[in-house]
Amino acid sequence: MTDQRKGSDAEPTTHFGFKNVPESQKAEKVAEVFHSVAAKYDLMNDVLSGGMHRLWKRFTIELSGVRTGNRVLDIAGGTGDLAAKFSKLVGPTGQVVLADINGSMLKVGRDRLLDKGVAGNIEFVQADAEKLPFPDNHFDCVTIAFGLRNVTHKEDAIRSMLRVLKPGGRLLVLEFSKPTNALMSKVYDTYSFAFMPLMGKLITNDAESYRYLAESIRMHPDQETLKSMMVEAGFDRVTYHNMTSGIVALHRGIKP
């Protein structure tokens, strides 16, 4: 699946929510969204998921296979939920890199983890998932939670993640996906396009950012499509686990 389409002037375009925009503008528009929501990102995660995001992330950690001494890269790591847990798992002989393209999110994550006193083995790096600034065959595990849908060229990002993994290393992609039954799909549509923007307006005074987030979820590849993208990028043994009736899916692949 490609993210590129051609407009009438032959300029490459891609989706930003339901809108079609020049590729060169998407990253800037996504950045504006996350600059806006960074300060209350954790609160909104709890409100909008009813706290379920913590269970989804816990399952991700369980399937990661991360252990003492490992190197872990958490892409789009935002406010540091996964990084904090991985920091404890890898211990003082391991390393966690929390990477995010958005400076505001990275600052919130750094400040939050420093306040918790768990940042001793965590490095904070502002980085683009499509062009990761790390050596080949460097990490034992790479994770990206609720970030891949915001990437312009998803195939490039997945290949970049493959490159930085060691042979036998694991990629875990936690992302909103396609509900597995029609009733849940209808309920989820109402929730996404009515409740999410309303809560965004009430809590952050920003309905538009949460309208974009709802739209971006609908534009993200479904479970089977993302699995195929990971296989085509070069990953082996790609599987996925649906959670909460497919509202969220966790994909896992191994570097040969």
From Swiss-Prot:
It catalyses: a 2-demethylmenaquinol + S-adenosyl-L-methionine = a menaquinol + S-adenosyl-L-homocysteine + H(+); a 2-methoxy-6-(all-trans-polyprenyl)benzene-1,4-diol + S-adenosyl-L-methionine = a 5-methoxy-2-methyl-3-(all-trans-polyprenyl)benzene-1,4-diol + S-adenosyl-L-homocysteine + H(+). Gene3D superfamilies: Vaccinia Virus protein VP39 (3.40.50.150). S-adenosyl-L-methionine binds at residues 79, 100, 128-129. It is an enzyme of class 2 (transferase). Pathway: Quinol/quinone metabolism; menaquinone biosynthesis; menaquinol from 1,4-dihydroxy-2-naphthoate: step 2/2; Cofactor biosynthesis; ubiquinone biosynthesis. Coiled coil: none annotated. Keywords: Menaquinone biosynthesis, Methyltransferase, S-adenosyl-L-methionine, Transferase, Ubiquinone biosynthesis. InterPro entries: SAM-dependent_MTases_sf (IPR029063), UbiE/COQ5_MeTrFase (IPR004033), UbiE/COQ5_MeTrFase_CS (IPR023576). GO terms for biological process: aerobic respiration; menaquinone biosynthetic process; methylation. Pfam families: Ubie_methyltran. It comes from the Bacteria. PANTHER family: 2-METHOXY-6-POLYPRENYL-1,4-BENZOQUINOL METHYLASE, MITOCHONDRIAL (PTHR43591:SF24), METHYLTRANSFERASE (PTHR43591). Belongs to the class I-like SAM-binding methyltransferase superfamily. MenG/UbiE family. Methyltransferase required for the conversion of demethylmenaquinol (DMKH2) to menaquinol (MKH2) and the conversion of 2-polyprenyl-6-methoxy-1,4-benzoquinol (DDMQH2) to 2-polyprenyl-3-methyl-6-methoxy-1,4-benzoquinol (DMQH2). This is Ubiquinone/menaquinone biosynthesis C-methyltransferase UbiE. The gene is ubiE.
